[in-house]
Amino acid sequence: MGLLSEFKAFAVKGNVVDMAVGIIIGAAFGKIVSSFVGDVIMPPIGLLIGGVDFSDLAITLKAAEGDVPAVVLAYGKFIQTVLDFVIVAFAIFMGVKAINRLKREEAVAPSEPPVPSAEETLLTEIRDLLKAQQNKS
């Protein structure tokens, strides 16, 4: 099997395609969460604690000199990134929890007993007839 045909067989497998779709959706979800945290969550929090814009919070380690930019420790962006992570982790946790609950409900649901075969039905009838004859005597 040639290299190209092996690659084609690998690339069109369901798991690889599903994984690629998951990665793309995950990246888009990450952007949505980042926007949600930066544009919706952080401004009210900043307002509540005195009008602070978290994205601007930083400690200047070395001031800018000429063409050399300042060296800063941007801890406000780090706080936003941590909040992004917490929200994504919580969303994934809730999704996994819901899937696990569905799996448990599916496993707990009682399955119907198998329908007896014609042979089993016949043997049951014979047994019942023999018991009935035995009880008469």
Curated annotation (Swiss-Prot):
Ranges annotated as spanning the membrane: 9-29, 79-99
Subcellular localization, as worded in the UniProt entry: Cell inner membrane
Annotated InterPro entries: Mechanosensitive_channel_CS, MS_channel, MSC/AndL, MscL_channel
Domain of life: Bacteria
Gene3D superfamilies: Large-conductance mechanosensitive channel, MscL, domain 1 (1.10.1200.120)
A single Gene Ontology CC term: membrane
Classification via PROSITE patterns: MSCL
This protein's UniProt keywords: Cell inner membrane, Cell membrane, Ion channel, Ion transport, Membrane, Transmembrane, Transmembrane helix, Transport
Family note: Belongs to the MscL family.
Assembly, per entry: Homopentamer.
Name of the protein described by the UniProt record: Large-conductance mechanosensitive channel
Source lineage: Bacteria, Pseudomonadati, Pseudomonadota, Gammaproteobacteria, Pseudomonadales
